[in-house]
């Protein structure tokens, strides 16, 4: 089970986008990386295709998961732990002790 999943609200802990928050849109567990909407934007040169025209486009680059943390209810970053509730393994916020997913 992953500590950070698609759809989680996260905050960036280090780097040029430190302090910015966003939603995880993709997780790459084999590379330990995640893509966050609107964070770590890079410019890519797009070759012309039938569907798209040529030009420079902005897109999100991936971040290492050690550089992001889930946002707790109070808006501060929290670590993630695991607990068994009703025979089911769930993620728990270390800061508040609340279950992250039902």
Swiss-Prot record:
Pfam family for this entry, one: ribosomal_L24
The protein's name: Large ribosomal subunit protein uL24
GO molecular function: rRNA binding; structural constituent of ribosome
Species name: Agrobacterium fabrum (strain C58 / ATCC 33970) (Agrobacterium tumefaciens (strain C58))
Family: Belongs to the universal ribosomal protein uL24 family.
A GO biological-process term: translation
SMART domains, A to Z: KOW (SM00739)
Coiled-coil intervals, chain numbering: none
GO cellular component, one term: ribosome
Subunit description: Part of the 50S ribosomal subunit.
SUPFAM superfamilies found in the cross-reference section: Translation proteins SH3-like domain (SSF50104)
């Amino acid at each position: 089970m992953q500590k950070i999943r698609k759809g989680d609200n996260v905050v960036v802990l280090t780097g040029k986008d430190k302090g910015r928050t966003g939603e995880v849109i993709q997780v790459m567990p084999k590379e330990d990386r995640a893509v966050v909407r609107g964070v770590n934007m890079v410019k890519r040169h797009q070759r012309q295709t039938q569907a798209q025209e040529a030009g420079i486009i902005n897109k999100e680059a991936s971040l290492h998961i050690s550089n992001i943390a889930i946002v707790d209810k109070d808006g501060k970053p929290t670590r993630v732990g695991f607990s068994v509730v009703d025979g089911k393994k769930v993620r728990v916020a270390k800061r508040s002790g609340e279950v992250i997913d039902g």
